[in-house]
């Protein structure tokens, strides 16, 4: 389950801090710019977590923190002007929160499943 938490942090939580889930039809920046930023946010979080967890030198966690924070310091692309649509703002907040909850459940199940598979593979390898 630890790897499920890491997966959630890297692929859902870190990118959502800059680009929360958006309702369909809402005003947003260009798709390509958002995709590039998401890639760098997830990549920076992955590299950052790896450097913090598997550090062999004192400076590696520092580089990991910088890698994790850099996309957020640069900033995610946002539209120049927001145009409110027919949907209430409360719905957008509820959608973003629900999206994170569903992703957290997904990554928890994924981490548990991976742990079960790995433990059964170890049992089979020991029995052979």
PLM region spans:
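Membrane-proximal helix-loop-helix units in multi-pass membrane proteins
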Residues: 6-49
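C-terminal transmembrane helix-loop-helix hairpin of multi-pass membrane proteins
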Residues: 36-37, 54-128
């Amino acid at each position: 389950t630890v790897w499920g938490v890491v997966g959630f942090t890297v692929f859902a939580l870190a990118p959502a801090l800059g680009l929360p889930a958006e309702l369909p039809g809402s005003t947003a920046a260009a798709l390509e710019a958002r995709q590039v930023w998401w890639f760098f946010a997830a990549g920076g979080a992955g590299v950052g977590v790896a450097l913090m967890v598997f550090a062999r030198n004192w400076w590696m966690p520092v580089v990991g923190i910088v890698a994790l924070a850099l996309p957020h310091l640069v900033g995610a692309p946002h539209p120049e002007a927001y145009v409110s649509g027919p949907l209430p703002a409360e719905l957008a907040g509820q959608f973003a929160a629900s999206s994170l909850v569903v992703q957290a459940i997904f990554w928890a199940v994924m981490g548990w499943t991976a742990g079960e598979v790995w433990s059964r593979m170890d049992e089979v390898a020991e029995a052979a």
